[in-house]
Amino acid sequence: MHRSLAGSAVLMLLLLFALGNFVGVQPGLVTRDADNGQLMDNRRNLRLERKTMSLFKSLDKRADCSTYCFGMGICQSGCYCGPGHACMPNGR
């Protein structure tokens, strides 16, 4: 492999790790059951805990919540129906 290709590959890997969304295996989360010797996964449901990461604010965080819901609970994404039937931004 040429030096320029190797440098590009290393740079791409560094960017992948720096900007990626990784869930690692932490020690102590996978254990062996004392009764039957089976491996057990002690991690909580990762799908529920996963938070998306982005370099830029997503559109729903910039949503304009200046509309009224009239008690029907219908607001834009990123908003909720608050007091006075006004859509309010979620506390993110």
From Swiss-Prot:
Q: Which parts of this protein are propeptide?
A: 21-62
Q: State the disulfide connectivity.
A: 65-79, 69-81, 75-87
Write the signal peptide boundaries: 1-20
Positions of modified residues (Asparagine amide): 90
UniProt keyword terms in alphabetical order: Amidation, Disulfide bond, Ion channel impairing toxin, Neurotoxin, Secreted, Signal, Toxin
Tell me which domain of life the UniProt entry assigns to the organism this sequence originates from.
Eukaryota
- Gene Ontology CC entries for this record: extracellular region
Q: So which tissues is this one expressed in?
A: Expressed by the venom duct.
Cell compartments where the protein resides: Secreted
Q: Which GO terms describe its molecular function?
A: ion channel regulator activity; toxin activity
Asked whether the keyword DNA repair is assigned, the reply is: no
Spans traversing the lipid bilayer? none
What does this protein's UniProt record list under function? Probable neurotoxin that inhibits ion channels.
* Membership in a protein family: Belongs to the conotoxin P superfamily.
Q: What is this protein called?
A: Conotoxin Im9.4
